Amino acid sequence: MKIVAINGSPRKNGNTAQVLEVVRREVEAAGVEFQVFQPGAKVHPCMACYHCLNTGSLRCVQTDDMVNDIIAACIEADGILLAAPVYHGGISGNMKCVLDRLMLAAGCGVNQLHHKVGGALCTLRRSGGMETYQQLLGTMDAMEMVIVTSDYWGAVHGADPGEALKDEEGMEVAA
């Protein structure tokens, strides 16, 4: 079994990356393969050229970022975890770019992610967690994924790198 996680933070060692490292340890301890993609700040937006949709290629014509690698890994994975920091009440711009392209190339129409298991978590300082969480869930819902929930929302609080790891309740939910 394999889970692919997409880290929507442009910060390499930010709270989202640190929380995903804890998740990695838990998942791998259970014998499940876990791969994290962090596209960083250099992600191009979808151009709505529909090449991926019209050709069924499952690839984006834009090839100078890692989105095609993410698309391929998500198609092969058994589960997908979308993880994002809250940026001004929603997902970060680079995460939006990744999800737009993933959804068009592998979701809508060709629906390679149909019935894949998906989960979401977000890191935040204070507010915007529910809105961000709903954006991530909405993307998975639109791709007809099976969404895993918990007894609490997937939010871990912390502003500066490392603070999220101190949110005991949030970390318990994430792990």
Task: Locate each region found by the language model.
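N-terminal beta1-alpha1-beta2 submodule of the flavodoxin-like/Rossmannoid cofactor-binding fold
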Residues: 1-108, 158-175
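Short, glycine-/small-residue-rich phosphate/pyrophosphate-handling segment
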Residues: 93-94, 108-154, 169-173
